């Protein structure tokens, strides 16, 4: 029998583990209370203990390498202005005390007495680098312009590795000497290149990282800090997605994204591949070595398993699930995985997609478009997808051109003036589905996926039965004008510049073609969204209503870019389901 939507939305997740200094406990995040909070569990197993008790989401937690204390991040109402808090020894204290600024935690000093982070404290726009003693005030150690994050703190405490981001697919790494304040560019390059997961070796002479500088895919590499040369350690065939180095330098844990699934690889500290544990199939992330470097904690999820924290003894132990996140009484055996398919598009390319099929032969279909656009639909656990499958829907998740996971060249196929080619890929997904007898088709997506929903409805109005736009972009010009200043700088290389490309951006924005929308539309947005301002939703709703179209609008006062709170998800998603049931069932007769 099908379960009500609320049951699926109450399926829990545990993720983001961090080891206590003695290696006996793991702190992690879980949404068991309805909003992600920090919890702790003994490594040997046992009942977990809640550590934070807030109404707002905790977005990250990290143990100090020394002493019984940790730092966690939290924002308010989805505004993404994360603040940093110290928790330990019965004390909970706001370290940042600057609610108007964004703070990105970068790590503890090796002695555990101070932290590093980047923040917009100075002017609200630029991410300066700060070091703060846990008992003192923040100190700017690098006054910057633009968007920066901290990749690693050298084991001897002498320098930081800082990432300067130019776009979602282009960044540089800098060495910041904490004694002199001198910065050194580590990754000179031309064009776009990513340098991810940087980890400094114990002797401070090299950095392990993942980069696509010298190829089409992101490969594992070792950067020599004296010569700046990079030795590549994996082939140029799939993206390396995770890199973590043990404290003693003995082990390097790596995973690659192979057709959306994670391929785990274990290396010795000198960069040579070693036999490793047999990991369960799924998507791995959040690698964290134990203080003694002999165990690895990680998060595992998959289409048929909700996220949980696992640990494994190295080099070849049996992975063990440490947390037991509830499936709300729904048997995991009812969860379905996708088929990996490819379909032809207008220029002869083959577009990869995940196709989730129910038992019904001629099911209504929801085409679910990922955001980004530099992102990828992967076979992770998605309660909404599983509900739709149980309800008799098929779900089709295409990775149209511009997606990551298939090489740098593929990611750039939708840049600026090529934007609408990705919308053509959506139209050809419908053609492929119709060839298989599937006629009643809705399109749904969030963030940039919401833009794709609106673009699909305006460019190809006859193909769609309904559309669901969640925190989506209706007008690329007003989006770039109103999003955060640092985000505008990151997004213009992808979408186009307001200064140079305004006319083109206006020509492809769905808001200027809203009269073409023929299918019923549902729009969902958070009032505090700092990425895609709520004015994007207001514009398209007003325009569709003015044109006499059918539109439902759900606005949540205490949310930002998406729905983080269970009470709001319990309100929104059943309404989305009712909307789809009504319009797709009507179309199917």
What are these regions (language model features)?
Residues 1, 244-249, 266-271, 290-294, ...:
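Extracellular/periplasmic ectodomains of large secreted or surface enzymes and adhesion receptors
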Residues 324-440, 446-447, 455, 459, ...:
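Cap/lid segment of the alpha/beta-hydrolase catalytic domain
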Residues 400-589:
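Active-site-proximal cap/loop segments of hydrolase catalytic domains
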């Amino acid at each position: 029998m099908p379960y009500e939507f609320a049951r699926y939305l109450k399926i829990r997740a545990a993720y983001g583990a961090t080891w206590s200094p003695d290696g006996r406990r793991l702190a992690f995040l879980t949404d068991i209370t309805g909003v992600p909070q920090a919890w702790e569990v003994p490594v040997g197993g046992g009942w977990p203990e809640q550590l934070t008790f807030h109404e707002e989401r905790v977005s990250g937690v990290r143990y100090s390498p020394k002493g019984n204390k940790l730092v966690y991040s939290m924002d308010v109402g989805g505004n993404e202005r994360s603040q940093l808090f110290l928790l330990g020894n019965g004390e909970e204290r706001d370290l940042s005390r600057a609610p108007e600024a964004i703070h990105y935690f970068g790590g503890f000093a090796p002695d555990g007495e101070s932290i590093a982070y980047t923040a917009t404290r100075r002017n609200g726009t630029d991410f300066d680098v700060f070091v703060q003693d846990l008992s003192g005030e923040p100190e700017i150690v690098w006054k910057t312009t633009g968007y920066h994050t901290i990749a690693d703190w050298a084991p001897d405490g002498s320098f930081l590795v800082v990432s300067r981001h130019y776009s979602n697919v282009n960044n540089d790494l800098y060495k910041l000497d904490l004694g002199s304040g001198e910065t050194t560019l580590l990754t000179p390059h031309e064009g776009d290149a990513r340098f991810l997961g940087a980890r400094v070796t114990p002797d401070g002479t090299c950095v392990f990282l993942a980069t696509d500088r010298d190829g089409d895919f992101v490969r594992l590499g070792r950067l020599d800090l004296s010569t700046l040369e990079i030795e590549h350690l994996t082939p140029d065939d799939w993206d390396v997605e995770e890199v973590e180095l043990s404290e003693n330098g003995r082990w390097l844990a790596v995973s690659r994204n192979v057709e959306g699934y994670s391929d785990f690889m274990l290396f010795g500290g000198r960069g040579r591949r070693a036999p490793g544990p047999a990991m369960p199939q799924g998507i791995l992330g959040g690698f964290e070595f134990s203080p003694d470097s002999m165990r690895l904690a990680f998060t595992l999820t998959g289409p048929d398993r909700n996220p949980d924290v696992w640990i494994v003894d190295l080099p070849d132990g049996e992975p063990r699930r440490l947390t037991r996140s509830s499936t709300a009484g729904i048997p995991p055996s009812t969860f379905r995985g996708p088929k990996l398919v490819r379909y032809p598009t207008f220029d002869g390319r083959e577009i990869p997609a995940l196709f989730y099929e129910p038992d019904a032969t001629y099911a209504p279909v929801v085409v679910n478009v990922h955001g980004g656009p530099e992102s990828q639909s992967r076979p992770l656990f998605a309660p909404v997808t599983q509900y739709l499958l149980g309800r008799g829907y098929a779900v089709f998740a295409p990775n149209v051109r511009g997606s990551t996971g298939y090489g740098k060249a593929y990611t750039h196929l939708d840049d600026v003036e090529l934007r609408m080619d990705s919308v053509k890929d959506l139209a050809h997904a419908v053609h492929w589905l119709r060839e298989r007898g599937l006629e009643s088709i809705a399109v749904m997506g969030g963030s940039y996926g919401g833009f794709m929903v609106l673009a699909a409805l305006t460019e190809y109005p006859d193909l769609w039965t309904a559309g669901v736009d969640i925190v989506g972009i209706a007008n690329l010009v007003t989006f770039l004008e109103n999003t955060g200043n640092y985000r505008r700088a990151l997004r213009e290389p992808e979408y186009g510049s307001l200064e140079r490309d305004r006319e083109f951006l206006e020509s492809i924005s769905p808001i200027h073609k809203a009269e073409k929308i023929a299918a019923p539309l549902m729009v969902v947005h958070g009032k505090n969204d700092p990425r895609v301002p709520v004015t994007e939703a207001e514009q398209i709703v007003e325009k569709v209503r003015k044109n006499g179209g059918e539109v439902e609008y759900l606005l949540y006062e205490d949310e930002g870019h998406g729905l983080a709170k269970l009470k709001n998800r319990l309100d929104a998603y059943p309404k989305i389901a009712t909307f789809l049931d009504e319009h797709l069932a009507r179309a199917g007769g």
